[in-house]
């Protein structure tokens, strides 16, 4: 029997800092969502690795969570990716066509060069080496495999240095400071 939706469904947008776990408890004492979000009964709709930053959605509505997180719904997820090296047209083409990873081929991604975005300082900062150029890409994917963006850029010879998710479907980081959250209408049209 399907569980009824909560009487007051909630959907939170959270700008997750680097080195924060996307869970509410950690026996090792690392930083978690409980350090930022005082709202009881919500849980992440999807994942964002500890070493990634940016948009994380949380909800108390299991049906909404399933629609957001389930790859069958193919909600586009937009990432700004700082990579080591200078991307060429061949590398971008490979990302756009999909790359083969150890767990199989990815779906095609939208990939483009991006001017360096204005972002908050990362703590700790990304390692800087004067002799190694870095560039930013915008990648839009419609799957959610473990560490997928990092593995895709590595597969085309562009190791990821910094990864920031800026959009999931209709929701974005617009105006949300690092470590901040806000509630939005809990629906996916």
From Swiss-Prot:
It holds the Pfam family PseudoU_synth_2. Keywords: Isomerase, rRNA processing. One of its GO terms (molecular function) is 23S rRNA pseudouridine(2457) synthase activity. GO terms for biological process: pseudouridine synthesis; rRNA processing. Its EC number is 5.4.99.20. Belongs to the pseudouridine synthase RsuA family. Responsible for synthesis of pseudouridine from uracil-2457 in 23S ribosomal RNA. This is Ribosomal large subunit pseudouridine synthase E.
């Amino acid at each position: 029997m399907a569980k009824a939706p909560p009487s007051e469904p909630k959907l939170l947008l959270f700008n997750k800092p680097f080195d924060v776990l996307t869970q509410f408890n950690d026996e090792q004492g690392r930083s978690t969502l409980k350090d930022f979000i005082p709202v009881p009964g919500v849980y992440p709709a999807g994942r964002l690795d500890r070493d990634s930053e940016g948009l994380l959605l949380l909800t108390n509505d299991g049906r909404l969570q399933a629609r957001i997180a389930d790859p069958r719904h193919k909600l586009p997820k937009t990432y700004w990716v700082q990579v080591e090296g200078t991307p060429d047209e061949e590398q971008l083409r490979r990302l756009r066509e999909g790359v083969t990873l150890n767990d199989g081929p990815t779906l095609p991604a939208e990939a483009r060069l991006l001017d360096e975005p204005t972002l908050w300082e990362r703590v700790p900062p990304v390692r800087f080496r004067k002799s190694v150029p870095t560039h930013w890409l915008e990648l839009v994917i419609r799957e959610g495999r473990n560490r997928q963006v990092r593995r895709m850029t590595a597969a085309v010879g562009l190791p990821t240095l910094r990864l920031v998710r800026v959009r999931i479907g209709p929701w974005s980081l617009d105006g949300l400071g690092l470590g901040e959250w806000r509630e939005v209408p809990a629906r996916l049209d």
